Amino acid sequence: MLEKFHKNKKDSYLNKEEGSLTSDGSDSPKEILETSERIVKKALQLTEETDENVHPEKMQLQKSNGVAFSLSRDSLETNDSFVASGPNQSNTGLGLDTLEEQEEKEIFFAKLEQEASSPIDYSRLNKELNLSDSIVLAPFVRNESEKEVESTAEEKCESYSEDFEEDTDANPAFKTEESQEPNSGMLAKVVLLDSQDSTTEFQKAAETSGVALSEHDLPQEVGGTEMNEAGTLCGQTTSDTEALHHAYHHHIDQSLGDTDEQKIHSSSMAISQCLVQVTSQNHNLYSKNTSTTESDLPTVEEFMRPIKGDCYNARGFDLEPESPVKVIGSTVNEHVNHLPYKEHKNESVWETNLLEKFNREDSIFLQTAANEDSFLRMPGKEIQTSEVQPDVLSKEIIQDCLLSQGSKTKQVLQSCCLKNEKSESTTTKQMLYKNIRSTTPLHKKKSSYGPHGVVRSSGYGKSTSYSKQSIPATERKIPKETLKKSIMKCRSPADKARSKEALFTTRTIRSAANQQASKEDISRAMPDQSVVQNLGHQVVDSFRQHHSDLPVSPVKSCERELRLLRRAQVAEEDLSRARDVIQQLTSTVSEKEKEMETKIVELKTRYEKELSQLGQENYVLQSKLRSVEELSKEKRWIHQTGTVSVPEEKLAQIQKEMEDQEVIIQGYQQENERLYKQMKDLQIQNKKNEEQMYKENQCLMSELIALREKVERINIQSQIVRESEPARNQSFTELISELRAARKEETKLREEIRRLKQDKQALELDLGQAKKERDLAKVQITSTSSEKSYEFKIMEETYKQEILHLKRRLHWYAENQDLLDKDAARLKEAREEIEKLKQEVKKLRAEAGDHQCVQQKKRLRDRAADAKRIQDLERQIKEMEGILKRRYPNSLPALIYAAAAAEKTNDLSAKTNTTDFLERRIKKLETELEGKDDEAKTSLRAMEQQFQKIKMQYEQRLAELEQLLAYKWKSESPKLNGDKANCIELELQLQNLKKTHQITVENLQTEIENLKSQNSQLKLRSKKDNKDLQLADWQMKQGNTKEKLLKLNQELITKNREIQDLTKTVEKLQKERMAMLSDNNLRNKTDNKENRQESLKNNTVATEKRNSCNSEPLIGIFNNDKIYQPHNFSDSNVLEVLQENARLKEEVEKLSLEMNQQRVKSQATLAYSENNIRRIQEDTAEYVAALKASHQREVEKILSQYTKDDSASKVAELNGRISTQEILIKHLQEQISEHQRHQEALLVSQMREEF
């Protein structure tokens, strides 16, 4: 039977794919529905028979068990909650509590039911537990109507079987609630816990998560790469699983031979497609949480992962793997056995949706590709039984498919891509899945059914782990240590941490009465089987049990698999490209953020530096002011002590009086300020008190009015009601007491008002006294200021005279300095001329040496020749003279000739020598005169300087003598004039001291202002220099960039011209091609006319042939193919033209690419140049800042030196400057004298050379 099942499965799958590829819509929707319903009925009958044969014990247990409790956490949705069902509900599930806790719960619930007068609301009980317990579980509140619906559902599903290793929770109430709520993001707040750890970790994780999960929205597809670390691996090693998969695959290959399923092709494809859509909803959410090892090979976790059978919308099971696994698919039996029992009548809607699905071939291909491997490898032992009617089940399958049909195509595409990415690991999985069917026995799980399994555990006992489940006899031989080692090897460190921090996703509590049924259910949770494969296998197997008609070749399936693998590779490449783009974008964004951060930091540092500099400048100026004030005081006392020797006792008395006056003035000032503040405060207080009194008066008036009204009312009531006399007396006494209290308050307030008025009058008197004192102080200040102003004027006139005298001296020194500068410039020019002359002399000597060698050689040759000629001529002359002497010994002409010749030669030589000598002498004398004039000027200046020195010395000596005389006269005058003269002199000295002090203060203020102006000028100069530097740099950079841009523009212009030329050539070639084609058409028309005249009988046939002949050459020409035709001339140039056209197009494309590349390069160069400009600007800014800092330091040093050196008065400062300038003048005069000596030596040497 299993072989037939697998054959039907294979054939239906292949027929479904062929139909999706080649179907032309021949089958109608009604036929599809009829065939699908027949298939589902037969599949359900078969599954019922097999399940009754295989699981009779479980059927009995489920029928006999009328009361069951479950608390299930199968969902990984964020909006799930724990569901607590009462004792009359059919929620069963596998629990993790110990037997002792279950017994305690039974006792507790028995007590509750005995004590309770009405039926217990377990949802409210869960809420109360949520408030007190450390585990936060949101209850799933149910109404009485829902409980009734669940009880009706319980009657239907008493013998309801499980799909894998979990009991069903067939609650129809879930369907309505789950259809209302959309699936939210799963695994967002999932908390997992290793079952081998204590429940304290469960509590901690629950407290951290803060989200209670329920079975409201369940994951639809589970097939991850992690194994259930807390459960057992059924005692299988990798070798065992490989052997099982090999055997299973071999069995499937044998069973693929004779199949006959042509009739159910379209219906099976439709239903499987719907189921694939249903089971691929949450694929994207679960695929994020897959955990795989680093190697490409499949691990034990991948082979031994537990199967999680979740159905769509809370038709799940109680057991679920603890690790977050990737959602891929669910089984057919989940959709068949766990659908809610609900009659669906809208079959026409399903038919229309089915027709729309057949038209979407692309989505069908992708959906079938996602589960292709699972359709080909399906274990036959996953078939479950149910007693549900086949018609109802088929309708519910269709309804589920329609519900999940809406917007799931994108999720299916993503699931396909993610599955095909792991094509390497699926090859090994195929070998493993072959062996499952042949060797693995069925195992059942323990289930604890009890009437009170709803309530959560207290958390003190250890939870039951999967290692306590029963293991088959063939697998019990393997020790537990090897299993633990294999588990620890498979687990990565991150997975270990996750498993310890996490919760179990399933937590169901059952009594220990029906443990044997759970043992039988364990065998359905095969850890080697992924849910992807179970879905496909069970869908196709259920369709192929009774319809095996059409055999399919395995070659087509291989080709389809290759196609799908290619598509998967393309999708992987697209994903990798998208990831690369995303990484590039993130890197660029991060770089820009870093640049912005660095700029912000630089700006902050600049502003902080500027602030610190300004603070330093302020501090320096304040310190200068203080130092100047201190110096002025010191100078005043020094001048006082130096000029006039006054007795120290009188000076001390005068100082004390001055200090006392200043203290008195400061005290008056402080008292005035204090009294003014007090006056303001008192005015404010008076205003506040007046406002308060006014308000209180108004309140009292309103109270009085109210009291009067009350009194009137009481009087009226007393007149009307005379019987209630004691009550009236009481009210009257109360009113009297209130009036007395009000009167007391009024008296108190009046006393306060009187007191405040008295205070006000006292303050006004104080103010009057303060004003009088202020007026007296003003009068005193004006009198003292008028006396001092006269003294200030006298001191100003004296100092103005001194300033004029000093300015004249400075002008004279400036003229001296100009003369010295001129002399220095002349010396520099003379030195430069001397150096030039020396260089020329060296050159001339070198040239003369060369010429002398050549000339000497020539002279030697000429001398030899001349010597011979001279000798000949002398000999001839002697002979001639002898002849003449012999003939005319005393002739006059001979004597005259000889005398004239001798005079001429002597006169010429004498004239030339004398003129040269005289000219040289004149030049020397002129230079000597100029030098002497300069010396006379310098000597005059020196004499003037000496005269000024002597004058200054005499003036100083006269001043000293005058001071001595004054001192002597003053010392003698007290004896003569007495005390009055001393007092007058002291007063005069005080006035003089005051005048000098004021003058010094004004001078210091003027100096400070000058220094400030100088500082501002220096700052402006530095700023201007910086701006000039920046402008120069910027202009240079702009010039470079402009040159580059011009070059690039020229290149662009040349390229554009080349492109235009190429386009022109292309247009010419196209025109030539069109002309050629038009000629061909004309020739064809002439040929057609001749053929028509010749063959009139076969007119229709000929026209058709001619039309075909006319169209075919044109098509060939446009397709770059030349077809031979006998009636057309053989045009050999057309192909060449087309080839040239293609070549030119390629060149144009290349040129465009080159242009783009050059543009990119130009942009890169521009960016690089901009970066360089920025860097240079930053460097210059730093350099300028450093220069500014150094300049400020130097200025500060100069100012400090100035303040240190200038401890004396302004006259001493100017004297110091004059002395320094005199020293400089002496030094320069010495240098000038040395230079004059050098010049004279040079002149002597030149004269010697000339002579």
UniProtKB/Swiss-Prot annotation:
Residues 160-169 have a biased composition (Acidic residues). One of its GO terms (cellular component) is centriole. Residues 559-782, 813-1165, 1210-1242 form a coiled coil. It is found in: Cytoplasm, Cytoskeleton, Microtubule organizing center, Centrosome, Centriole; Nucleus. Belongs to the CEP162 family. Depletion of QN1 leads to retinal dysplasia. Required to promote assembly of the transition zone in primary cilia. Acts by specifically recognizing and binding the axonemal microtubule. Plays a role in cell proliferation and differentiation in the neuroretina. Has an ATPase activity in vitro. This is Centrosomal protein of 162 kDa.
